[in-house]
Design a protein with these regions (language model features):
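N-terminal domain-onset segments
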Residues: 1-55
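Conserved, single-site charged/polar hotspot
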Residues: 37, 43-51, 61, 79, ...
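A generic structural signal for short beta-strands and their flanking turns/coil linkers
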Residues: 41, 72-74, 96-98, 114-116, ...
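Extracellular/lumen-exposed scaffold segments
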Residues: 54-63, 67-72, 89, 127, ...
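Mid-length scaffold segments of soluble, non-membrane domains
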Residues: 62-113
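Acidic, glycine-rich flexible loop segments
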Residues: 104-136
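Extended, aromatic/histidine-rich regions of cofactor-dependent oxidoreductases associated
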Residues: 136-172
Length: 172
């Protein structure tokens, strides 16, 4: 089993069996697994980030109102379907995980309308690994009781990223 297949299997198990999953009891009873795109090696990138030295703290709106504070950490640029795309990577605290909330051409059609998230990994030689096969829906995609950061306008791209989680049926 590939790393991605194992990751998805573990996530499906968590969603279907764990009472801490974002699914309601009723949703868990009907759960047969999340919907995913097939694995795409073309949507895995090792990128050199442009680090932002001014440590700008920003407020990102939440799906339930209000906002959450985070920091713009770096800018990444990559080629996708013949288009140069630029996205901002965020970090809540120094040394904390890197977070990429984004909205793309699939949002609202093939994937959750508000957008998806990607946890960006550090790679060798000051590069970042962005593997969109691991892109995931925020918990509020499954249950309105969750509050989720909304991808900011700077992370909304027109290109379609057909990798990671797809839209989830509304079983509320």
């Amino acid at each position: 089993m590939s790393d991605l297949a194992n990751f998805r299997s573990q996530k499906d198990k968590y969603f279907g069996e764990d009472h801490n999953s974002p699914l309601t009891d009723r949703q868990r009873e009907m759960f047969n697994g999340l919907n995913y795109y097939g694995e795409s090696t073309e949507l895995t990138f090792k990128l050199t980030p442009t680090l932002l030295t001014d440590d700008i703290e920003v407020e990102i709106p939440l799906s339930t109102g209000g906002s959450t504070s985070t920091h713009r950490w770096a800018i990444v640029s990559f080629e996708l379907n013949g288009t140069r795309e630029i996205l901002t990577v965020f970090r809540e605290e120094e040394g904390g995980p890197l977070f990429l909330p984004f909205r793309d051409g699939t949002s609202g059609k093939e994937t959750y309308g508000m957008g998806r998230y990607l946890e960006v990994q550090s790679a060798e030689e000051n590069k970042l690994l962005m593997d969109f096969n691991y892109a995931y829906n925020p918990f509020c995609a499954y249950n309105d009781n969750w509050s989720c950061p909304i991808p900011p306008p700077e992370n909304r791209i027109s290109s379609s990223i057909r990798a990671g989680e797809c839209i989830y049926p509304d079983w509320n």
